[in-house]
Amino acid sequence: GEAFLMLHRNKKPNDVHEGKWIGVGGKLERGETPQECAAREIFEETGLRAKPVLKGIITFPEFTPDLDWYTYVFKVTDFEGELIECNEGTLEWVPYDQVLSKPTWEGDHTFVEWLLEDKPFFSAMFRYDGDRLLESQVDFYE
């Protein structure tokens, strides 16, 4: 069946995502496009060569005390290679019907559902206070 490759963040010290199951990702490097960043991060963390497809954008106002986070959400169905050991956590193929039962950010459950349902391109906002989701909004674009 179909599955998401998820990362159980259980290896990095002082990790804002510690203990949570999240998608693979990372920060843009200078001069890099979001697409290039996604492909690079996927390769660095998983060993897979992937062709990421942009599905949405999420804003996280004041996700850390001094920073807003702007996140590009990609979905990958076209990839090749063998999984490697990840230094940020444990990689696991999680069947679609089990993804929403994994401990993660509350907002992640929401946008993972959008990916599972193949919703149109989205622009969303999730505002947190620590681990608690305070507010969210989304626009879908046909």
Segment roles from a protein language model:
Residues 117-142:
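Charged phosphate-binding loop/patch that engages nucleotide di/tri-phosphates or the phosphate backbone
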Residues 1-22, 49-50, 54:
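N-terminal strand-loop-strand
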Residues 56-59:
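A structural microfeature
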Residues 28-51, 61-115, 136-142:
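Unchanged
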Residues 25:
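A short acidic, glycine-rich active-site loop
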